[in-house]
Regions:
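Short, exposed interaction segments that mediate macromolecular assembly or regulatory contacts
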Residues: 69-79, 107-121
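Long amphipathic alpha-helical coiled-coil segments
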Residues: 101-115, 142-157
């Protein structure tokens, strides 16, 4: 059974549900808003799967192996993979927001302090760093373990390192 995109979308939406900008679409019906959000989620999922694919150690997994028509991956994702992709989507979403802030800063120049004080920008930057750090932690955890959960991924680890790791287990 293939994992539906909706599983990943729901994890992503749970992360951003407090962000009114993502869900605020004036003069749109509820159905139109749902379509817009779904398109937005798909766009982020598409980019995230490509990027995550390049960052994982397990080359047998291909997150771009998907069926967009059925809105599903062509294989079953494990929970940490769903979370990894959703977290990357979350990071990409905030990177886009960062670009908007920088564009506004460039456009407004010194006047930006009237609209976005330095403290708020610093808070945003700190939040982005935390999101990236959380993603990196999930990625490291994913890369360190075998997909079936039976042990650790020791691909590319020397025999000396294996004996050190084995002594911890």
């Amino acid at each position: 059974m293939a994992t539906k995109y909706e599983n990943v979308y729901n994890r992503f939406i749970n992360k951003i549900k407090k962000d009114k900008n993502f869900f605020s679409y004036k003069n749109c019906t509820e159905d139109e808003v749902e379509v817009i959000i779904k398109r937005r989620c798909f766009s982020l999922l598409d980019e995230a799967t490509i990027l995550v694919n390049n960052e994982i150690a397990n080359f047998e997994i291909d997150f771009t192996d998907r069926n967009d028509e059925d809105e599903a991956f062509n294989f079953d994702l494990i929970k940490i993979e769903e979370e990894l992709i959703a977290e990357k989507m979350y990071f990409l979403y905030f990177k886009e927001e960062e670009v908007k802030v920088k564009q506004m800063q460039k456009y407004l120049g010194n006047d930006i302090s009237m609209f976005s004080p330095a403290e708020e920008r610093k808070t945003f930057e700190n939040m982005l760093e935390k999101v990236e750090s959380r993603y990196e932690k999930i990625l490291d955890d994913y890369n360190a373990r075998l997909r079936d959960g039976s042990g650790y991924n020791l691909t590319g680890v020397s025999e000396d390192e294996v004996s050190v790791v084995s002594s911890w287990i």
